[in-house]
Each structure stands twice: as structure tokens, then as C-alpha cells.
Amino acid sequence: MSNESGRFLFTSESVSMGHPDKLADRISDSILDALLAQDPHSRVACETLVTTGLAVIAGEISSKADVDYEKIVRDTIVAVGYDDPDIGIDGKTCEVQIRLDAQSPDIAQGVNSDEASGKDIGAGDQGLMFGYACKDTPELMPLPIALSHRIINRITEARFNKEVDWLRPDNKSQVTVEYDGNRPVRIEAVVVSAQHGPDVSHDEIEKFVIENVVKPSIPAELDKGDIKYHINPTGKFIIGGPHGDCGLTGRKIIVDTYGGWGRHGGGAFSGKDSTKVDRSAAYMARYVAKNIVAAGLAERCEVQLAYAIGVTEPVSVHVDTEGTGKIEDAKLCELIREHFPLTPGGIIDHLQLRRPVFVETTAGGHFGRDGEGFTWEKTDKADALAEAAGATATA
């Protein structure tokens, strides 16, 4: 997205770990992590469906690991906060169906090449993946999605800390930011839907959410005193989670990425091991874009990588700095190929993606995060890129 002049509004949303689609993501990645903990070379494509009183796990898994799938499903549902049938699903008593097969040998033959050394692994599928970074926030994320995540993280913290007794697991946020060119200047509107128990008034919910959730989460300088608040705008939100809506793995791909700012290749992340470039190459694309911005080579940067199934090298690399680049985008493409490993095996090794680190990605977004597991958020290539770009510019 390029808009160097003029004012405009942009909106992004986030959802909590108790949202039915996010609960499904969390179950899928909990299974992935359990398998990787025992067998780092596990091949996993695990999909989850959750609805009233039922969780269904289906997909393709090839692994030497021996895990109790049903226990993982139940433990995950309870840990999120669904431990009472009155709120839609109880992990202790709900029905759990497991429908898992081995990975197709037709897919495996294109991926297995020299896997013992971790090199020359072919891509697990064709596809295109995007990464994005910008200077809106310290974590180099677009501000609307960053603020939406902060609000969700804060309401989740309030629920787990029992700051009030009426909060339930299913929560949503949405933030509209006004920009002047590429600069965020004010917050236009905030929407929060907070699932709650039956014995609380709308006024109490609204006051708590605005004063204790939203205001601590947004920059004071962007609050001009005229924010439009929409807190539980339907009036009540008692029925939620899998009881209110059926949840499926992979249905919150915009929440998982950049909130609609920049493009998306269409592939979901959760439940997939890192031979699936839908996940690993999207992480690498973010890593590349973030390092380009951190190096001062652009204010905004979108990177596209594209792959063919069974083929090691990407079929294309594309960069779009939205007119903010300090050197030509074509030169940045050359630097990317020189400084970043772009084969599936190289990505897996460099970002250490065979570790059981993925369940933490399922709430709060996959990008703009802290923590040891989020290796794709490092900016350890920035200095080398800046130096190489300087040499390129003077050559």
C-alpha cells in the first residue's frame, strides 16, 4: 500500500485465543509442537474443527513420535479457559474425534531430498508468500494490527489475572487509524467484543474495557479525545467460542499477519511443519523485510517469495518498498539472494524451525513478537545489509 500524501483511514482486527478459529489453530499447533519435541523431522499437516461439545482432528502426519492426541486436544481446550459446558465446550468432557493419515508419498518424494543434512529439501507445495515491515511501531509492524493485538493481549491478561470475574475466553478487537501519508496521526475508532457472563451490566463492561484495556494499550499522543468506542455493540456477548461459531484451523490468516496491510499469499500457518513453505517462507519473508527496514534501506518494505513443489530454490523474489527505498528495489532483490538463505532447508536451519515453538504464535499474531522462539523477528542482518547497500550505491 502506497499513499505518500493525503489522509486516509485503515482498520485491522485481532481475536483472542478463545475465538473458535484461534482455538482450532492452537490445538493444531499444540499437536505440531508435541510431535516436534520428540521427532524434529516430523511431517505435519493437522487441521482442527471445534463446535459445541466436539473437537475433530484430521490431516496427514508422518512422525516417529508417540503422542496422545486426545490428551493434547483436551488439555489445550481447558488451558484456554473452556472447562465448563455452560460456556460452549468443556475440554474435560467434550467428544474428540481423531482422523489422521500418513503424508502422501507423492508429496514426500519431492521434499525428502538429502534431508539428513538439512539441505536441498524441496518445497512442500507451490505457492507465494509475503512478508512486510514498516516504521509505524518499534517492532516494525503496521500500527492498526499492532494496536489490535495489544488490546487482545491486555484483555487476555485481565481474564487470566481475574481482574474481573465476568470475562470469558472469546474476545475480538478492531482499531481504525488515521494516516497522513505514511504517518499515523490519530485513532479514529476502537471496537471490542468481550465475551462475558450473564451477571454483569453493559455499562460495567464498557467502563472496564475502555479504562483498563483500551487506554493502556494505545499511544496517548494518538488519542485526540474523540475516539469512537464500540464496546459489545450488539448489547451482550454471552454465547461465544465454539458454541457461538464453529471454529476451523487457518481462518484468521489476516489476523496472523499484517491486518490487511500488504498482500497475503493465501496460505495458513498453524498445524504445518516447516517443510510447508506456506509457513516457513512467510516467516523468512518477514525476516527479510524487517531487516531491510531496520537497516534503514526503506521506510516500508514488502517481500514476495514463490516456490514450486519439490524445487529447492524460489522461482521468484520480489521487493516493493512503496517508494520509500534508499536504493532500487531490483538491487534489494540482489542483496536478498546474497544475504538470506531462501531454500526450504536453509530457511529451516537459519530460523531454527524444527523446534516446538509454534503454539505461542497462535494468539497475538505471528509477527511483531518478542521471545526466543520468534527467530524471524531478529534484525541481525541489518548491519550487513546496510554495509552492502552502501557499497552497491557507490559502485
UniProtKB/Swiss-Prot annotation:
Main location: cytoplasm
Classification via InterPro entries: ADOMET_SYNTHASE_CS, S-AdoMet_synt_C, S-AdoMet_synt_central, S-AdoMet_synt_N, S-AdoMet_synthetase, S-AdoMet_synthetase_sfam
Origin: domain of life: Bacteria
Pathway(s) this gene product operates in, as recorded in its UniProt entry: Amino-acid biosynthesis; S-adenosyl-L-methionine biosynthesis; S-adenosyl-L-methionine from L-methionine: step 1/1
GO cellular component, one term: cytosol
Group of enzyme by EC: transferase
Binding residue positions for K(+): E47
GO biological process: one-carbon metabolic process; S-adenosylmethionine biosynthetic process
Annotated binding of ATP, by residue: H19, D170, N171, K172, K236, F237, D245, R251, K252, A268, K272
Gene Ontology MF terms: ATP binding; magnesium ion binding; methionine adenosyltransferase activity
Keyword Metal-binding: yes
Amino-acid positions noted as binding L-methionine in the UniProt annotation, renumbered to this chain: E60, Q103, D245, K276
Record EC number: 2.5.1.6
Cofactor(s) the record lists: Mg(2+); K(+)
Compartments it resides in: Cytoplasm
UniProt region (Flexible loop), positions on chain: 103-113
Residues that, per the record, bind Mg(2+): D21
Gene3D superfamilies per UniProt: 3.30.300.10
Keywords: ATP-binding, Cytoplasm, Magnesium, Metal-binding, Nucleotide-binding, One-carbon metabolism, Potassium, Transferase
Co-factor binding comment: Binds 2 divalent ions per subunit.
Catalytic activity: L-methionine + ATP + H2O = S-adenosyl-L-methionine + phosphate + diphosphate
Described function: Catalyzes the formation of S-adenosylmethionine (AdoMet) from methionine and ATP. The overall synthetic reaction is composed of two sequential steps, AdoMet formation and the subsequent tripolyphosphate hydrolysis which occurs prior to release of AdoMet from the enzyme.
Family: Belongs to the AdoMet synthase family.
Subunit structure: Homotetramer; dimer of dimers.
Record-given protein name: S-adenosylmethionine synthase
Taxonomic placement: Bacteria, Pseudomonadati, Planctomycetota, Planctomycetia, Pirellulales
